[in-house]
Amino acid sequence: MLSPKRVKFRKRQRGRLKGTDERGSSVSFGEFGLKAVTSGRLTARQIEAARITINRQVKRGGKLWIRIFPHTPITKKPAETRMGKGKGNPEFWIAEIRPGRILFEMSGIDEETAEKALSLASYKLPIHTEFVKRSAL
């Protein structure tokens, strides 16, 4: 699963996801993409589950780019622990997603297969997404 090799700070505050994503909002590498419509937090496990689903659909054909990375730690206190006594230990990693962000990109396959694969992958994610094509510039 995806996780950073090193981080400057082990623990982070939660914060809020306001606004839309300007960076990473266009299909850059492939021909087709999966774009976030709502904001949310994707765990490394959810990203991996979507990746496996896409790869199962396209089999050997095509290339896949994962345009997001989980570099925010989420902490958790042990079960049956009283309140207080500091912040819990990092349990897993998340990627904070705003509307407009491209999550996955694909190329080397036909549009119908790409749309089916990305649609099935979207069921594994806790946010609403849409299928997008590269705009002809």
UniProtKB/Swiss-Prot annotation:
Role, per record: Binds 23S rRNA and is also seen to make contacts with the A and possibly P site tRNAs.
Cellular component GO terms held in the UniProt record: cytosolic large ribosomal subunit
Superkingdom of this protein's organism: Bacteria
Chain coiled-coil ranges: none
PANTHER family: 50S/60S RIBOSOMAL PROTEIN L16, LARGE RIBOSOMAL SUBUNIT PROTEIN UL16M
InterPro entries from the UniProt entry: Ribosomal_uL16, Ribosomal_uL16_bact-type, Ribosomal_uL16_CS, Ribosomal_uL16_dom, Ribosomal_uL16_sf
Region span, Disordered: 1-24
Quaternary structure annotation from Swiss-Prot or TrEMBL: Part of the 50S ribosomal subunit.
One Pfam family it belongs to: Ribosomal_L16
Residue ranges, compositional bias (Basic residues): 1-17
Example GO biological process: translation
HAMAP family: Ribosomal_uL16 (MF_01342)
Family in the record: Belongs to the universal ribosomal protein uL16 family.
GO MF annotation terms: rRNA binding; structural constituent of ribosome; tRNA binding
Keyword Glycoprotein on entry: no
Keywords: Ribonucleoprotein, Ribosomal protein, RNA-binding, rRNA-binding, tRNA-binding
Designated name of the protein: Large ribosomal subunit protein uL16
